Structures are given as C-alpha cells and as structure tokens.
Amino acid sequence: KYFIDQRGQAPLYFEEEGKKYNKPSYWAENKWLNNRYYQADVPVREQEFAEGHAVRAVYLYSGMASVARETGDVTLLKACDRIWKDIAERQMYITGGIGSCDVGESFSYDYDLPNDTAYNETCAAIGLMFFARRMLEIRADSSYSDAMERALYNGVISGMSQDGKRFFYVNPLEVDPEACEKSSIHFHVEPVRQKWFACAC
C-alpha cells in the first residue's frame, strides 16, 4: 500500500537522484522518459488513463486493484475502473494486445493501433492478464475474463515456441520480412521467434 500511495507524490525518486548528483537523472535524457512514462505524473488515484511503459503500467494497475480490494479503497477502485475502461475501449487491439508504441514499449494515444508497427509486448499481455484477474476478483464482469482469454491465446502462448526455446518479444498483427530488414520503423519487429533478447523480461 505504501508504494501505491507514494506513486506520483513529491519528492519523486528520479528528481531526487538528479539533485544528489547535481545533474539530470540518466533517465531524464530522452524526452519520452518523463513522469508520465513512469506512471508518476499524478498520484495513482488521480490517473485518468493508461500511460507510459505498458508492462510496468499493468503491473502497477494490478497492484492498485489488489490494494483496492484488500482495503476497500473506493477512490483507488474508481481509478482502476477508469484505467481499465481506457485500456479496453481505446488502447487494446482485437487480439488483446496493448502498448502499441515501440518508443518506450508504451501506450500511445486513443485508437493508435497500427498493425505493422504494433509493439504488443508478450510481457504486456501477461501483465494485462494480471490486471484483469484482479479486477475480476473485485467484480464479476465478462470484459475482464474476455480480455484475459484474448491476451492468453494471442499474446502469451503465441509469444513462445512449442519447445519453449524461441520467443516473440513483440506481437504485431502484420509482418513483412523485407520491411523488418529495410524499414527503420519496423526494426523492432522480428519475422520469426528469437532464441534470446538483450532485455528479457
């Protein structure tokens, strides 16, 4: 509960780190690495929509839902409801994939759901299932179980080969092998499952 309550409150860790070393945080060098990216721009109870790094976001939202359920925190549950509605209605592919933007592996803006450059990280599908499960434990609503099923079959199971030795990090809806090789906007897409990734979740 402490970490949920502290998220988005001053002082922010990365800002304090910058003061300590008398320079901007390493993480502040890129424009998109801001407090919204870390889901820390406002206290969690004030968050209106899914934002930032998709995997970290749904892990945070899972924690928020668990704390809301255990403590009866109505304000926190309302934030979870708003965020869930945003994901389910404006940020999710028909496959259950989330996190459409390859820059920062993140949520983008409403209805930005491209097929060929979709990120839809396998780990985000797993995190979405965690969030949906926790929401389903609070209230029986088929939107949660439907999202779990879509994410499981289209983003989790598909992310690993049957022998468990090769993986998809991203799950776009359209793959052109030539584009993966020659177009910089497709460099994050692999046409076949890979043995290993530089950053494995």
Task: Please place each PLM-identified region on the residue numbering.
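Glycan-recognition and catalytic cores of secretory/periplasmic carbohydrate-active enzymes
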Residues: 1-201
